[in-house]
Swiss-Prot record:
This is 2S seed storage albumin protein. It comes from the Eukaryota. 2S seed storage proteins. The N-terminus of both large chains is blocked. The C-terminus of the allergen Ric c 1 and allergen Ric c 3 small chains are heterogeneous and the length of the chains can vary from 33 to 36 amino acids and from 36 to 40 amino acids respectively. The allergen Ric c 1 small chain acts as a calmodulin (CaM) antagonist that inhibits CaM-dependent myosin light chain kinase with IC(50)= 0.25 uM. Pfam families: Tryp_alpha_amyl. Residues 64-87 are annotated as: Disordered. The modification Phosphoserine is found at S69. Disulfide bonds join C49-C108, C61-C97, C98-C145, C110-C149, C162-C212, C175-C201, C202-C249, C214-C256.
Amino acid sequence: MAKLIPTIALVSVLLFIIANASFAYRTTITTIEIDESKGEREGSSSQQCRQEVQRKDLSSCERYLRQSSSRRSPGEEVLRMPGDENQQQESQQLQQCCNQVKQVRDECQCEAIKYIAEDQIQQGQLHGEESERVAQRAGEIVSSCGVRCMRQTRTNPSQQGCRGQIQEQQNLRQCQEYIKQQVSGQGPRRSDNQERSLRGCCDHLKQMQSQCRCEGLRQAIEQQQSQGQLQGQDVFEAFRTAANLPSMCGVSPTECRF
């Protein structure tokens, strides 16, 4: 849990957790590699949002996220007593954060929350559970402030070639099983069932081209999430587990950055 997750991978997980918090709006946000023909236009839009965010005062949101490293642990609820001073302060900061977010253009609000959460993680050099709590608090901002994180429909030609391989490997069913076992917290020592699932997962990956393995794992987790098998912080753990599966199986790439 103390391992520092690569920022690129963490940001991807952060987006999935934020999207889960926005489920009431029936929207999903994903990070997918983009092709060169669309990259310049979409990259320009993202850059414009970043520039706008840098000009805005989002200090209340920053303070609200900063509290995450000391106030609670994953899965631990804060005791909310009537008149509790800490709770009143948190609620006030969250409301102030929402007011600040509303000063940002609608299409840039999700990017704003992502940006300040990224900054907290990078500047604070947060590890494991601390970075996860920042992601959870970012999700609270999204749901409480009514921010709509729209789905990105970017495509990559290479994904078309991978689709057939992923289907041939039954959407990496054994990898899904192994990830589910790991997320459920069956302990550091692998059971016989876990060993079998891992071997089956490695067989799936070895039958695929290198450039398709991480895409296959990403789609496997997305499928589990859409079926309700993974929610909240479980999504975070699933991506963390999947990131290291190629290395565990002795195939390339050594790490998936989702």
